[in-house]
A protein has these predicted regions:
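N-terminal signal peptide c-region/cleavage motif recognized by signal peptidases
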Residues: 19-21
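Edge beta-strand at a domain terminus
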Residues: 119-138
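Central antiparallel beta-sheet cores of small beta-barrel/beta-sandwich binding domains
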Residues: 46-101
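Bacterial N-terminal signal peptides that target proteins for export
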Residues: 1-11
């Protein structure tokens, strides 16, 4: 199996999984600033971006998790309990498992995700994501 650009692929999967989800009960639609820090192979990769979260995103949980999933991945299993949220899914190519937990409020959320890369000696990648509402969408 090729390992070229593997950290980039894994980061893209993790960020898209985390960054496109919302809290149906608590999160208020609007413009959010997302900040992620992903640690893989001893390197920390920071990413920041802004995203407009709509009421549809909130109602479908897609502000936190890409509900279509990634190619070769199961759809995310999203569970909500009040302000707490958990997400799990697996991928077959490359073979990985994702397990994350987070806390949601009306104008912010935080999320921690652990990704196990099974084809790379069960290497663990961790992503921490925070998002803060900046105001209405522009």
């Amino acid at each position: 199996m090729k390992s070229t650009n593997r950290p980039s692929v894994l980061l893209a999967i993790a960020v898209s999984a985390v960054s496109l989800s919302a809290a149906a009960q608590n999160m208020k639609p609007g413009q959010y600033e997302y900040t992620t820090k992903t640690e893989v192979f001893g390197i920390t990769i920071p990413v920041s971006f802004k995203q407009c979260v709509t009421q549809k995103d909130v109602d479908s949980n897609s502000a936190y998790v890409n509900q279509q999933g990634q190619k070769n991945c199961t759809p995310p299993d999203v569970k909500r309990n009040g302000k707490e949220m958990s997400v799990k899914y697996t991928c077959t190519d490359p073979k990985m498992s994702f397990d994350g937990t987070g806390t949601v409020s009306e104008d912010s959320f935080s999320f921690d995700m652990k990704v196990i890369q099974h084809e790379m000696n069960n290497n663990v990648m961790r992503t921490k994501l925070t998002a803060t509402r900046l105001g209405d969408c522009k």
